[in-house]
Amino acid sequence: MKKVLVVLAALAAFSGLAQAQETIKVLSTQELVNVCKLPASPESRSFCIGFTTAVYETYLATRHPQRAKPFICVKQPAPARDEVIGDFVKFAQSNQQVAEKPAAGVFLGFMASRFPCARK
């Protein structure tokens, strides 16, 4: 009985190691550009809008105004969503060094350069 418990414990330990080595697939900038390029299918357009909106909304929701100065300041009236996405696609295509980087971070960097905050 003790041998069975030892074997089960060893299997449990090794299965945890196998799971710990699993890599998480992150959407690359090139993959996002491929989805956001026009003309886009309704599915691609929906994914592109959903992803970029979620990244921006997450930035807004998680930035604590007293602890972190804003780095994206969209002036009102804001430009059309399609205009911003089109500018992002152009930015990514002209900066191929970001093609394999995570799309969320590159999109935030683009937004920061496109909509900088006034320096005080």
List the predicted regions and their residue ranges:
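Sec-dependent N-terminal signal peptides
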Residues: 4-16
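Sec/Tat signal peptide C-region and signal peptidase I cleavage site
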Residues: 16-22
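Residue-level recognition of short, well-ordered coil/turn positions
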Residues: 17, 40-41, 96
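Short N-proximal segments of mature Sec-exported proteins
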Residues: 27-90, 110
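Substrate-binding/catalytic groove segments of enzymes
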Residues: 59-66, 97-99, 118-119
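Cystatin/cathelin-like cysteine-protease inhibitor module
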Residues: 88, 92-93, 97-98
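C-terminal partner/receptor-binding element of secreted or periplasmic proteins
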Residues: 101-120
